[in-house]
Amino acid sequence: MKDMYDVLVIGAGPAGSIAARTAAEKGLDVLLIEKRQEIGDPVRCAEGVNKAYLKKYVEIDKRWICADLSASHIYAPDGTKIEMAEELSGGEVGYVLERKVFDRALAEKAAEAGAEVRVKTRATGLIIEDDFVKGARLMHLGKEYDVRAKIVIGADGVESKVGRWAGIDTSLKPIDIETCAQYLIAGANIDQHHCEFYIGNEIAPCGYIWVFPKGDGKANVGIGVLGSKTGKFKPRPVDYLNKFLENKFPDARIVEMVFGGVPVSGSIEKTSTNGLMLIGDAARQSDPITGGGILNAMNAGKMAGEAAYAAISAGDVSLEKLEEVYEKPWRATLGHDIDMSLIVKNCFINLSDEDLNSLAHSLEKVKFERMSLLDLLQALFKADKKLLWDLRVLFKDAAKEVVKNKT
């Protein structure tokens, strides 16, 4: 490990690895570090991604594909089922990944592009001089190193310390985080061609339960519950998950379990400062509705890698330059989608089970493989006129997209 690089990327998840690869492909000298000894472990998500969007960032490799989904089924509190084609099911439906293999493959691609990759290497603080981030203090195999870099990219996940060290407020309130629990189960009779989502305040308060098949009778079964609905004297997310498992898959065997948190806060005020950018969960760039963050992280990582090249080439890594080449571009694209999702989240967390059932009944007969904006408007108007009004900004935005696509 050298003491000077162009770019230091802290965290080797999808965001960090894509950022490192992108910067290295541009000819920059890059160090990518991961605090754990094994990249991709532990897994902390349902592992589902949209096929078309994934192909934008990486060539598909069957080694890290567990299942190929064609649809999703959403179940209302009363059991009403809504079927949606894969293309309309959002960023988390399409392929089910083996994240332990996938994340490692992304890091390998970064290494092949020229980045240096170091595991069991933890950042313990930033080097800050004259109000500029100049690198980080690292701990590797019991030895401390001061590593300098022209730009530091913080990709250290939901528990990020990098942003806080740099003076960026990444704090989360209980309502801004989903508390999650997930089991990998085996021995269950699970359809391997679609995933399932279960909603309802008795099932997962202000959240949902997911079932993602992983082949050979295995599946990820997990739950996310809004942090404001957990705490002292309240059931834990794992309690809701255990109850669901007992009812839905009584013969299943739990072979692995993971716990964690997912940011659902929407965009934070600031994701860059002099000499530093935040990406992925560290920048709170996950989807506020689903908590899904793989594709958003890869998108942000690519933008950050390109921004690092632009800033270093210009000899200017100031906040003003990083706002120009990273902050403004990501907010105009990815950030816009996150903001729209936050509007939906804030509407739906206030719906009662009766409201959710009414909405499901209105959507039950809709053919989602060819649904139009007008179809959705009519269904929402029938179910809940107030909900339609609350979401009006989304439809105004969607209508603009329809017009743009037709011209």
UniProtKB/Swiss-Prot annotation:
Q: What does this protein do?
A: Is involved in the reduction of 2,3-digeranylgeranylglycerophospholipids (unsaturated archaeols) into 2,3-diphytanylglycerophospholipids (saturated archaeols) in the biosynthesis of archaeal membrane lipids. Catalyzes the formation of archaetidic acid (2,3-di-O-phytanyl-sn-glyceryl phosphate) from 2,3-di-O-geranylgeranylglyceryl phosphate (DGGGP) via the hydrogenation of each double bond of the isoprenoid chains.
Catalytic activity line of the entry: a 2,3-bis-O-phytanyl-sn-glycerol 1-phospholipid + 8 oxidized 2[4Fe-4S]-[ferredoxin] = a 2,3-bis-O-(geranylgeranyl)-sn-glycerol 1-phospholipid + 8 reduced 2[4Fe-4S]-[ferredoxin] + 16 H(+); 2,3-bis-O-(phytanyl)-sn-glycerol 1-phosphate + 8 oxidized 2[4Fe-4S]-[ferredoxin] = 2,3-bis-O-(geranylgeranyl)-sn-glycerol 1-phosphate + 8 reduced 2[4Fe-4S]-[ferredoxin] + 16 H(+); a 2,3-bis-O-phytanyl-sn-glycerol 1-phospholipid + 8 A = a 2,3-bis-O-(geranylgeranyl)-sn-glycerol 1-phospholipid + 8 AH2; CDP-2,3-bis-O-(geranylgeranyl)-sn-glycerol + 8 AH2 = CDP-2,3-bis-O-(phytanyl)-sn-glycerol + 8 A
Instruction: Return the protein name.
Output: Digeranylgeranylglycerophospholipid reductase
Q: Which organism is it from?
A: Methanosarcina barkeri (strain Fusaro / DSM 804)
Keyword Oxidoreductase on entry: yes
Enzyme class, first EC level, given as a word: oxidoreductase
Task: List GO molecular-function terms, semicolon-separated.
Answer: FAD binding; geranylgeranyl reductase activity; oxidoreductase activity, acting on the CH-CH group of donors, iron-sulfur protein as acceptor; oxidoreductase activity, acting on the CH-CH group of donors, NAD or NADP as acceptor
The UniProt entry, under Gene3D superfamilies, shows:
D-Amino Acid Oxidase, subunit A, domain 2, FAD/NAD(P)-binding domain
Return the similarity comment. Answer: Belongs to the geranylgeranyl reductase family. DGGGPL reductase subfamily.
Pathway named in the protein's UniProt entry: Membrane lipid metabolism; glycerophospholipid metabolism
- Miscellaneous: Reduction reaction proceeds via syn addition of hydrogen for double bonds.
**Mind telling me which Pfam families this protein's record contains?**
FAD_binding_3, GGR_cat
**UniProtKB keywords:** FAD, Flavoprotein, Lipid biosynthesis, Lipid metabolism, Oxidoreductase, Phospholipid biosynthesis, Phospholipid metabolism
Listed GO biological process terms:
glycerophospholipid biosynthetic process; membrane lipid biosynthetic process
Q: Is Lipid metabolism one of the keywords?
A: yes
